[in-house]
């Protein structure tokens, strides 16, 4: 029992240490979310036509400083363990990033003409053939833009045109052939569906794994006079990441021994939150641009995705922390119960022992009295005989 108590106490100590480690990670993520939120505000400002490119250049300098801090946050460590650099993740399978739109009509496919597009309620987006379509996307830290006339082009053509303009097959439109509620499979092997289970239209990255990751993209519709059509723009920009890009990797999750037996452990997968991991920095080290209005609009989408990634990770960390706290309470209760049981078996029952002592003492005293009386009687009898 002594060994069991010590084992339970050590397991409890492990859970407390694990919680402390996760609090360090959570602090870094909270700070990163604050920074990304501030950057989104600046990107929104940079997307305003009232600013000149020289103004945006000053914003870019500030952007770069903030993203330097994001990278510093990703290097936070606990006892020499770099928690947020992406090294400690569970086994994953390679996935191709997917973006799904559930703002357009449920029967929308890649073959639907832009002029025929409707919103979820079936109301026309009123896109005219003379309207201009501007598409911007961020990949490997670089922003690509293209503008063309709507004409009789289709939804699929939006992505094919920007592939042609950028000279890179950034998007794979084969998945847009049909509208479906099933999107694909994520890095853990689970099927992914639209949030409400209704049909949506999905476009995928042109390359599997993180090499093909699109940090974000925006689609803007303007009329021939240059006025933005907000309803159409909002509906077309309703593509959100439904499957994250992931490379195949082995299991390297952090492990906390939370029990006294082999196998009673808890694995914790913690993803990276560096600017590169969030799609905000290219392989050349350069950060995303807000140098032009179009770049800034694409940056807004990229920052939205980055914020969601960190918040998802923070939610996971919160779940790990809650489990460790409940486990610690359970281990503490077990330790107390085993200690009490040990005391019952080993330690003396004081009340019982006092009662037994008093009883034995009375018996001894009675015996001594009887012996003394017997001695007196013997002496008296001998005196009579003498």
Residue ranges and their predicted role:
Residues 8, 42-43, 338:
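Non-transmembrane amphipathic alpha-helical segments
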Residues 1-13:
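Short, charge-rich amphipathic alpha-helices with coiled-coil/heptad character
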Residues 306, 313, 317-320, 324, ...:
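Amphipathic, heptad-repeat alpha-helical segments used for oligomerization and assembly
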Residues 16-321, 347, 369-372, 376-386:
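Amphipathic alpha-helical coiled-coil/heptad-repeat segments
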Residues 330:
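Glycine-rich phosphate-binding loops at beta-strand->alpha-helix junctions
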